[in-house]
Amino acid sequence: MLLKRLSGLGYEWSVGNKTGKKIMTTRFELRARYIEGWYELDADKLISSTSHDFVFDDPAEPEPVNRKSLPEYMIRWDKRTRLLGATNVWDLSDEVRQDSDGILTDWEWWELAGTDLCGMAIVKTRDDGVFFERITYFDRLSNSS
């Protein structure tokens, strides 16, 4: 189960009800759902994890993506990356997490398996959802001499 896997990545868990089931705090749960939405290319799951003022900043896009335009962006992203040979399998590493003043901030290095596509991402989540993501791209070819 993905949530079980995510707990090993530093997702905060707290004891819930008397049965001892573990539940995540709201912003951690919404962040986990957001990740699932991307892994599964599930627009409904993705939208349900974002706040009303959500902004996604991808330098490959002419303007920032908002909550309303996120499903169309996800389709463009999938088409773009499949042209590069991707199958939507992600490798995330060098993850750093900070939970401060009600905002969960995640930084991570991302790589899209089967491609040279990689970069950094910062994602910010409140208890009403993911409200900001910015990605950058790293190009090994242009940095080699």
How would you label these PLM feature ranges?
Residues 25-28:
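Amphipathic alpha-helical repeat elements characteristic of tetratricopeptide repeat
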Residues 20, 55-65, 80:
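A short gly/proline-enriched turn/hairpin at secondary-structure junctions
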Residues 2, 6, 11-13, 20, ...:
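A beta-strand edge to alpha-helix "cap/lid" segment located at domain peripheries
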Residues 32-36:
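Amphipathic alpha-helical repeat scaffolds
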Residues 40-57:
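Short, well-ordered alpha-helical segments enriched in acidic and aromatic residues
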